[in-house]
C-alpha cells in the first residue's frame, strides 16, 4: 500500500512539474489567404500551459483588394513536438470568427439607380457577412535566441459559405 501511495505522489508531482512551463509570447506575422486573394497581417498571443500544450489567440486583417476586405479572430490549440535542436513542429486545431465585406457588389448605371437601391436595400451595393468556423493545420518554429522564434504555419479554415487556406510566417517574442 505504501508503494502505491508513493507511486501516486510521484506521478502527481511529475504532472505538476510538467505544467509549470507557463511561458507567454506575443508575435506578428504576414499571411496570404486564398479566399481573400491578398496578403494580410496579424498579431498573436500564445500561452504555454505545459511544455507541449500551447493556447493561442490571433487577430488577422487582410488588405483591401478589388473592394474585398476581411478580418478574422482565432483561438487555436497547439501540441508541440521537438523534432531537432531548437526546432518544434505542431498540429493545430481551433475556432475562428471571420467578417468580410465586398464593396461595389452591385453596380449602378445612374445616380437614380443608386438612390433607389439605397432606399430599398439600405446599402451602397456592398455585401458583408460574418461567420464562425473551425481551423485545422500545422506549423513549425525555430528558436533564434532565448526570447525570439521564427515560424511558418499552414491552416485550413472552414467557414460557412466559404473555406480558405491560409499560409503565414512571422516572429514571436517571449515575455
Set out the residue ranges of the language-model regions.
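Outer-membrane beta-barrel proteins
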Residues: 31-33, 45, 63-65, 79-81, ...
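Internal catalytic-core helix/loop-beta-alpha segment
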Residues: 113-127, 131-133
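Transmembrane beta-strands of outer-membrane beta-barrel proteins
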Residues: 24-28, 55-57, 73, 89-93, ...
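Extracytoplasmic loops and strand-loop junctions of Gram-negative outer membrane beta-barrel proteins
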Residues: 25-28, 117-124, 152-154
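Solvent-exposed loop/turn segments connecting transmembrane beta-strands
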Residues: 29-41, 62-70, 131, 157-167
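Predominantly the C-terminal beta-signal and adjacent terminal strand-loop region
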Residues: 62-63, 143-175
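Gram-negative (and chloroplast) outer-membrane scaffold detector with strong preference
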Residues: 46-114, 142-146, 173-175
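Cleavable N-terminal export/targeting peptides
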Residues: 1-23, 114
Amino acid at each position: 500500500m505504501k508503494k502505491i501511495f508513493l507511486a501516486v505522489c510521484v506521478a502527481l508531482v511529475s504532472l505538476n512539474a510538467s505544467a509549470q512551463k507557463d511561458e507567454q509570447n506575443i508575435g506578428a506575422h504576414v499571411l496570404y489567404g486564398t479566399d481573400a486573394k491578398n496578403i494580410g497581417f496579424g498579431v498573436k498571443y500564445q500561452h504555454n500551459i505545459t511544455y507541449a500544450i500551447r493556447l493561442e489567440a490571433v487577430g488577422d486583417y487582410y488588405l483591401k483588394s478589388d473592394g474585398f476586405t476581411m478580418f478574422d479572430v482565432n483561438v487555436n490549440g497547439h501540441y508541440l513536438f521537438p523534432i531537432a535542436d531548437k526546432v518544434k513542429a505542431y498540429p493545430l486545431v481551433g475556432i475562428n470568427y471571420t467578417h468580410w465585406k465586398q464593396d461595389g457588389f452591385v453596380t449602378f448605371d445612374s445616380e437614380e439607380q443608386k438612390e433607389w437601391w439605397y432606399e430599398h436595400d439600405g446599402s451602397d451595393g456592398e455585401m458583408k457577412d460574418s461567420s464562425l468556423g473551425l481551423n485545422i493545420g500545422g506549423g513549425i518554429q525555430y528558436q533564434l535566441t532565448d526570447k525570439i522564434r521564427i515560424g511558418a504555419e499552414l491552416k485550413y479554415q472552414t467557414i460557412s459559405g466559404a473555406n480558405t487556406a491560409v499560409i503565414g510566417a512571422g516572429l514571436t517574442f517571449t515575455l
